[in-house]
């Protein structure tokens, strides 16, 4: 099956607090989209590049200040945008991101930095065609972290995640769609796929009827 080209590509960002189910949804969406012939790339932030790796190390050691984390995050994101996001959407692919700039706004905002300034610092980052916000209460997110065998890091507390959740929900981004992620993975996937299909229906037009029919099947 030849890949179906999407005019101007498509950028899907999946957001939410830790334990919301972002990685699971990203993988499920990619599998579905690839199955109907859409070239699909899954990436994440922080990336596996040098800046992203440095940041993940700091999440364990806690040695970076919020301001230092912002600097590293922005360096990582600029490289991500230039090396992967822009080239892939430019060739008509679907790019699915497991976290993007709203995570920086929420997490660094929860650490006390001004949300408006954080949004302005990310003005260079392409805006998602659809931003899927998986919403769960912090107590559920933390429970899921423990259930998958992980240990919450120094920031993953009920209080901090509550502040992050509030910022996520308050962000005024035109493509943001909130999904109740307390539901099971199948229900969340179905809701997310429907929202992605809404954008594809506009992008692909009549030529995409077959693709949309397969996605709905």
From Swiss-Prot:
Annotated positions binding ATP: 16-23
Entry's EC annotation: 2.7.4.9
Xref: InterPro entries: P-loop_NTPase (IPR027417), Thymidylate_kin-like_dom (IPR039430), Thymidylate_kinase (IPR018094)
Keywords: ATP-binding, Kinase, Nucleotide biosynthesis, Nucleotide-binding, Transferase
GO biological process terms on file: dTDP biosynthetic process; dTTP biosynthetic process; dUDP biosynthetic process
Record-linked SUPFAM superfamilies: P-loop containing nucleoside triphosphate hydrolases (SSF52540)
Reactions listed under catalytic activity: dTMP + ATP = dTDP + ADP
NCBIfam families from the UniProt entry: DTMP_kinase
Protein name, per record: Thymidylate kinase
Gene that specifies this protein: tmk
């Amino acid at each position: 099956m030849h890949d179906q080209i999407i005019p101007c590509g498509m950028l899907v960002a999946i957001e939410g607090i830790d334990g919301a189910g972002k990685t699971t949804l990203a993988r499920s969406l990619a599998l579905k989209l690839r199955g109907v012939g859409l070239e699909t790339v899954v990436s994440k932030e922080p990336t596996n590049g040098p800046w992203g790796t440095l940041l993940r190390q700091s999440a364990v050691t806690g040695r970076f200040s919020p301001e230092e984390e912002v600097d590293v995050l922005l360096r990582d994101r600029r490289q991500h945008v230039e090396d992967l996001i822009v080239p892939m959407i430019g060739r008509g692919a679907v790019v699915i991101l497991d976290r993007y700039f709203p995570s920086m706004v929420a997490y660094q905002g929860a650490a006390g930095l001004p949300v408006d300034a954080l949004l302005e610092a990310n003005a260079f980052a392409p805006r998602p065609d659809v931003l899927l916000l998986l919403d769960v209460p912090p107590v559920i997110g933390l429970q899921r972290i423990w259930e998958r065998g992980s240990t919450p890091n120094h920031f993953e507390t009920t209080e901090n995640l509550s502040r992050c959740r509030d910022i996520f929900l308050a962000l005024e981004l035109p493509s943001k769609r909130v999904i109740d992620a307390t539901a099971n993975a199948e229900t969340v996937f179905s809701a997310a796929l429907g929202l992605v299909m809404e954008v594809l229906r506009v992008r692909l037009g009549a030529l995409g009827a077959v693709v949309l029919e397969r996605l709905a099947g």
